[in-house]
């Protein structure tokens, strides 16, 4: 069984929205109380409380506070589990010598939502093509909320968990489905072998010279973003107008995110449908987008320029594109080969003679000093990773096996159903 997440937009009425808001407030209160309990226990008696210590106290909490009963035991346990995971991540970073980031108290307006970690306490019903209903709770206190969205996995998909989130005044429900391999299989319409070099000048360059333009969603919205932030800076902090402009800034960030995901979903889907082999190189965007500020003793150089470059790297969504290619390739029976960048050096290696030709980042044309081969820098890199994909025993990623459906019918064509209300995934 495979797992796939589908997101629905919720349309609760005023009473349901007020009730959901109160539930988020209670989950936030539980999270903060559990965090305070852990801190106090360590400060007073030197004891570190575990998840199970706090989970065992839930019956007493529900007996003293009746409003916690309707939230459901499993949802309350998941909130405590979130705090436990935050502490595990904190101790892991301390051990690794990284910036620790101690878990912090959360304001209810910034608490994103809550989760039902199993199918108990809620139900999803698909009504027609794009309409759905999500029922939360049981008995006479249960509430039904209209939702918009659909999935392409059919009636055989079994709901696994539900996450309710509030974002910029809107409500969403993310449902994890357990589906069979046949249900999530994608039809592949081509058998091309393509090398891809992801970048910033062009979002993608292929070994045959074709390119995909970089949409630059953040850069296109920067004038509007700067204008809103200037207006907000002139308002009194905490005032109605200050908050109103803050919501507009958040909406603009959300719009940029939606445009980016839409572009990535459509582009990666089109790519895995047309290719039997996709070759690319390993990208570590976290390292690529590190700050150049430095320290007080060793201040960084060209900090503003590096900040602008980091913004462009993150705006391109290259890491998200790799993730989408990985799971969609499994569904379509496409092999994705990820070359080891440090060993292969695709931007410095000649695709014709395989010799290393050092170049600076400003040199956009590859001219080999050994064999005279000339090509665009990104096209040459794409050709190098494609050759590497055809070399046995190379690459850093496991090669996914085709699903049963693709082994038998790799060229069948079926109509794709959008995985969510907003994009075709």
Where are these regions (language model features)?
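Stable alpha-helical structural segments in soluble proteins, enriched in small hydrophobic residues
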Residues: 34, 79-90, 379-389
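Residues on one face of amphipathic alpha-helical coiled coils
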Residues: 26, 30-33, 37, 82-85, ...
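Long, hydrophobic, amphipathic alpha-helical segments used as structural scaffolds
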Residues: 35-42, 87, 91-98, 179, ...
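Acidic carboxylate diad motif detector
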Residues: 52-167, 294, 311, 315
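Positively charged, helix-rich recognition surfaces that bind polyanionic ligands
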Residues: 3-5, 18, 152-155, 161, ...
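Gly/serine-rich nucleotide phosphate-binding loop at the start of the catalytic core
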Residues: 1-78
